[in-house]
Amino acid sequence: MTVLTVSSPPIEPVYPSGDGEPVAETFDHLYALLITLEVLRQYLVGEQATVLGNQYLYYAQGYPRLRTAPDVMVIFKVEPGGRDNYKIWEEGQVPSVIFEMTSASTRDQDQGFKRTLYEQLGVQEYWQFDPKGEWIAEQLRGFRLQNTPEPTYAPITDGQSQPLQLRLQAEGRLIGFYRLDTGEKLLIPEELAIALR
């Protein structure tokens, strides 16, 4: 008697899109996240880029637990539009810029695990914004990946984002974005509505 052994096809792991956790710690953090997301989304309309907010970034194929959820991430050289989550190996691009809306309670994770992870992934710039000024006196600070054998972040001292071609500055509980080529401020939705009246 011959016995056939049938092997089952490999099972693709499930990559969840949600974790059941709140989007942000406080209203100020949520507002800063949503405004940053929308301002950058509008700024990059027509570009080969996407801006995602509080969605899982999967960085190791086959290991769905190896993930993080940046508050805002900008990825260039990909199809524009939303996604339920972002898998680096499917898209072929690492985020160029990541923003974390940080607080005293997320400080250690934002300064430790996330900063190290983003360095290792090759994220060009990492910005931390503390809308309540709980631990970053100047509220906003950025780090740029250095072109060295070992990926390392160095502080951005001029407030300029090279990938975005914008100057960033803290403006109360939001980040102000200014074009490097014209100096023009990118308007938030409320400012845009007033300007259109």
Residue ranges of model-derived segments:
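A short acidic/basic microdomain associated with nuclease active sites
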Residues: E47-A60
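Generic preference for hydrophobic
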Residues: V51, V72-V74
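Short acidic/polar active-site loop segments enriched in Thr and Asp
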Residues: Q124
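A structural signal for short, well-ordered beta-strand segments and their strand-loop junctions
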Residues: V51-L52, W127-D130
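C-terminal interaction segment
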Residues: M1-E25, E38-V39, L57-P70, K77-V97, ...
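A structured, charge-rich N-terminal accessory region that forms the first stable segment of a protein
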Residues: E25, H29-L40, Q48-T50
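Short, solvent-exposed loop/edge-beta patches enriched in aromatic
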Residues: Y43-Q48, L66
